[in-house]
Amino acid sequence: MRFRLTKAAKVLISLILAIVVVVGVVFGLKSGLIKNDIKDKKTNKEVNAVLNDTETSDDPDTVMTTDKKSASTINVSLDEWIGWKSIIDANGGLTTQKGSIYDQLGIDVNISVINDATQSSNALIKGDLDAAGYTVNRTAFLSTKFKKAGIDVIMPYITNYSNGGDGIIAKSNIKTVKDLVGAKIGVPEFSEAQTLVVWFVNNSDLSDKDKKDIIDNLVLFATPDEAAKAFFAGQVDVAATWEPYLTQAQNMSDCHILFSTASSSNLVMDGILFSKAFADANPDVVNKFIEGSLKAADKYDKEFDAIKAVMPMFSTSSNEDIVDNCSGAKLTTWKDNDNLLTGSAKIMYTDMCDVWKSIGEDADADMVDSIFTNTYIQNIASEFSATETSVDTSKTKVTEDNKQTVADTEALLGGTASVTFIKNTSKFSDTEAASQELDKFIDIAKILDGTIIEIAGNTDPNPNSDPQDEYNKKLSAQRAEAVKNYFIMNGISADRIVTVGNGSANPVVDNDTEEHRAMNRRTDVSFKIIEE
């Protein structure tokens, strides 16, 4: 379950937590009245062995609605997440209401509220559901389950991006991914928050040993709340969690937000996963389902009756609470989907398969090309494409005012691009090899779309160069610009990029051998978060 509170509620909860957590929890831990619920590691296989045969849920908020009226009926499950609101608004309730968008399009949609992904995936496999809402992260986690069950699935629609609701909090001295080495890191097991930590570790320039040590020694908790409480009680140095704990960390002097999804639209994306058999048999119904949800976007922060009726967690919420929750998820447009389903969604799915494998779980990366399709989005192009634009997900831009701040900010994540240039020029010596090397950084840049990218060119020290190193500075700056231009040609906004020519001032090794000189002729790519 994912949600955000109003600003007033965040402040109140932060004050309460500051008192209760710091005083009450610490006292409780010392006295033995409160036990620290740190989970033993379990594998996905062990969890599924217990839960795979479960078709009912003890969750009191589960609401099943699966009446199949006709071939134009879709049975879909959603968890209690604000990002599904456009689907609910298009439907008008758990069932399609007369005069609603879906009713006008001629389809019936039955919504089941299921917070348990095991239960919803079982129902999808059994055929009780035609579709279910999952994050791309969760879809990767469930991939082998669907494959072993012999059910093909597709995700033809990304509904929303997480927009700051999930993140990583840390002690003040932990500022980069490299600082995670040796730190105690608390994560909620099998959660989107856990995948954030592992994704950053996997995409860092840490050694394989350091990566393995971090991942193998994650401290597992049952929920994001428990991970956060352990952090504020001093039991862990870092915690992957969600709101309101991110705000609490931001308001304290000895800790901070290391990362939140406000700096990345793509790390946590939600979409609707369909049974491929259903979609193949009923393409027009799927088309209209997507069309109706997209057309309901203008109701997102304006109409509230339907979501109050459908989702128990919002049933007593004020309109202000719901609007504040809406800020935690940004709805996608038709244009976003056309781009995502052939681009970032595939990158993210593949990365998440690697994440799950890193922590010992099964995931099928080979399903990436069969799961994501823009066929259905293209089928409704005439309804949207002439006027649609992508959501502007850029949160930060390089300006003259913040260039120095960018330079002074330590990079959250960085790496070295081993790109070689023709001697004394800024031209790639091997364009194909350079492309392969730089593409991995472009993929990261597309995922971390709310970060500033610093590209720093470096040369090896030349004993015959001028004392001020002006030639090397100019050459290294030109080489950084060459890398920047490659980024721009591949879809990265120039507004996000700052280039630096270090000359020969920052060698990484002694310049005593040809191998070492080659190591010093490098381009460093860093991803930085600049607070507004």
Spell out what each predicted region is.
Residues 2-117, 125, 333-411:
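N-terminal hydrophobic or amphipathic helices and topogenic motifs
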Residues 375-453, 529-532:
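Periplasmic peptidoglycan-binding/tethering modules of Gram-negative envelope proteins
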Residues 280-364:
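Secondary-structure end/capping motifs
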Residues 33-221, 237-243, 266:
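Short, glycine-/small- and polar/acidic-enriched structural segments
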Residues 82, 86-89, 115, 119, ...:
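Extracytoplasmic/secreted proteins, especially bacterial periplasmic and envelope-associated proteins
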Residues 458-532:
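Periplasmic OmpA-like peptidoglycan-binding domain that tethers envelope proteins to the cell wall
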Residues 74-75, 109-110, 182-188, 235-236, ...:
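Second-shell loop/turn segments in exported
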